[in-house]
Structure formats: structure tokens, C-alpha cells
């Protein structure tokens, strides 16, 4: 992955975590990795554990939102979420939810950030 894309992704994930925190979410961890994949943000909202995939794009149409996180990626996120829950049993009593946050911005051109939060973006596919 080109360095520019990594920086753009890191910017988006940090921005999304701050955005969620200002809305009352408790950020549990970021960039949680296992062999099955990575979850960008794991947060808590009331009695729900929220697994968040963040996509930062320089340009896209909102008509494309349905294909931004494909079925294969969704499955990897779900598998990784199960590993998280197995290793962090204190969250097992909570409901789980999979969200997607899409940011449209190019911080290298000092563009404003346009954010779309899609709660319940997909269901557990495993």
C-alpha cells in the first residue's frame, strides 16, 4: 500500500475515533489485529460493543456505499470480532453491532471532512 494511502487511512481512523468519542462512545481499542484480519475501531455504546470499519476516500459517490465494504471483508471483520470477544470476555454479555464510517476528504489538500456513519451496516456472516 502506498505511503500516501496509509497516511490517509490513519488520518481517517483517528478522526473517526474522535468523532465517535464526542458522541458518547467509549473507544476500547484501535487497529485490533489477528490472523483473520483487523478491526479499525472497537467501541462501546451503552450496552453494545461496536466493531467499526473506517474507510477514508478522496472521492466517491455515496451511491457506492453499498460496495465499499464487500462481503469478503465483512466476513473477515466478523471472524476477527469473534476472536476479540473470545479474548475479552468482559464484553460477552453485550449486544454486538457492525458499523461502517466513511470519510470523504483529502487532508493533504486541506479539504473539509464529510462523514457518513452507517450503524448496523452489516450482520455477522460467520
Curated annotation (Swiss-Prot):
A matching Pfam family: UPF0102
Protein name: UPF0102 protein TP_0913
Family classification: Belongs to the UPF0102 family.
Domain of life from the UniProt record: Bacteria
A molecular-function term among this protein's GO annotations: nucleic acid binding
